[in-house]
C-alpha cells in the first residue's frame, strides 16, 4: 500500500512540470531565419525552467548553443551544442540566460541570434487540503412546542347580591318633629297609692305610743 502511494506521488510530481510547461516556436510562423529581429519576438514572453524552445529552419541554417561572449561576437567556436536537423527542440533546464545563434557565415550578423532569459519554474499549486468534513448531523430536532395548558376558566359571573333585609320601621319620631299619630307614647310612671285618713291617724297614734313608752323607760332607769 505504501509503495503504491509513493509511486503515485512521484508520477504526480513528474507530471506537474509537464502540465505547466510551454513550448515556444522561435520566430512563430517565420521560424528560425535570417533578417528577423528576435529581440522583438521576445517581447511580452516569459520563459521558465521546464519550457521548451522549438527551432524550425531550412537546410541553410542550424542552431548553436553558445555563451554570452560567443553571442556578442557571433562566434560559435565555443558552442556547447550544435543542431542541424531542421526542427530542433531544446528544453530550458536552468535559471539564467541561454544564448543561441546560427553558425552559418553572416547569418548571426544579420540578426539570427537569440538570448532567452529563463526564470524559475512556476510554483506548483498547493495540494488541496482534505475536504472539509461533512457537517455534523444536527442535534435532535427541537422539541415540538408543548401543548398549551388548558385555557384559564372564565371568571364566574358575580353572584347576584341579595337585597338588603327589610328593617322594621324605627320607632323614633320622624325628623320633621311632628309626632306620628300611630306612634305609642310610653305610659306615665304609676304614682304610689295615697294613704287613706284612717291609716294616717293610726300611724300617728303608734308613733305617739312609742314615744311615751321610751320616755317612761328613761324615767325609770334614771
Curated annotation (Swiss-Prot):
Residues 1-21 form the signal peptide. Residues 22-120 form the Phytocyanin domain. Probably acts as an electron carrier involved in oxygen activation and/or lignin formation. It comes from the Eukaryota. It is a lipid-anchor; GPI-like-anchor. It is found in: Cell membrane. Pfam families: Cu_bind_like. Disulfide bonds join 74-108. Residues 121-198 are annotated as: Disordered. The keyword Secreted does not apply. The gene is UCC3. InterPro entries: Cupredoxin, Phytocyanin-like, Phytocyanin_dom. Cu cation binds at residues 61, 102, 107, 112. GO terms for cellular component: plasma membrane; side of membrane. Residues 125-172, 185-195 have a biased composition (Pro residues). GO terms for molecular function: electron transfer activity; metal ion binding. Keywords: Cell membrane, Copper, Disulfide bond, Electron transport, Glycoprotein, GPI-anchor, Lipoprotein, Membrane, Metal-binding, Signal, Transport. The keyword ATP-binding does not apply. Its main location: membrane. A lipid is attached at residue 198 (GPI-anchor amidated asparagine). Residues 199-222 form a propeptide. This is Uclacyanin-3. Gene3D superfamilies: Cupredoxins - blue copper proteins.
Amino acid at each position: 500500500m505504501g509503495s503504491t502511494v509513493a509511486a503515485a506521488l512521484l508520477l504526480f510530481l513528474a507530471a506537474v512540470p509537464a502540465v505547466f510547461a510551454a513550448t515556444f516556436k522561435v520566430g512563430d510562423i517565420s521560424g528560425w531565419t535570417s533578417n528577423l529581429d528576435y529581440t522583438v519576438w521576445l517581447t511580452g514572453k516569459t520563459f521558465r525552467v521546464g519550457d521548451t524552445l522549438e527551432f524550425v529552419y531550412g537546410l541553410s541554417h542550424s542552431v548553436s548553443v553558445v555563451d554570452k561572449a560567443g553571442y556578442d561576437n557571433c562566434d560559435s567556436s565555443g558552442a556547447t551544442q550544435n543542431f542541424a536537423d531542421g526542427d530542433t527542440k531544446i528544453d530550458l533546464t536552468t535559471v539564467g540566460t541561454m544564448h543561441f545563434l546560427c553558425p552559418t557565415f553572416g547569418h548571426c550578423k544579420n540578426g539570427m541570434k537569440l538570448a532567452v532569459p529563463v526564470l524559475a519554474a512556476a510554483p506548483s499549486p498547493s495540494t488541496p487540503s482534505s475536504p472539509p468534513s461533512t457537517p455534523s448531523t444536527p442535534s435532535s430536532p427541537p422539541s415540538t412546542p408543548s401543548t398549551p395548558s388548558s385555557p384559564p376558566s372564565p371568571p364566574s359571573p358575580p353572584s347576584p347580591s341579595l337585597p338588603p333585609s327589610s328593617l322594621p320601621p324605627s320607632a323614633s319620631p320622624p325628623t320633621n318633629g311632628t309626632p306620628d299619630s300611630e306612634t305609642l307614647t310610653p305610659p306615665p310612671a304609676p304614682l304610689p297609692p295615697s294613704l287613706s285618713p284612717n291609716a294616717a291617724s293610726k300611724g300617728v297614734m303608734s308613733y305617739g305610743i312609742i314615744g311615751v313608752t321610751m320616755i317612761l323607760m328613761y324615767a325609770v332607769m334614771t
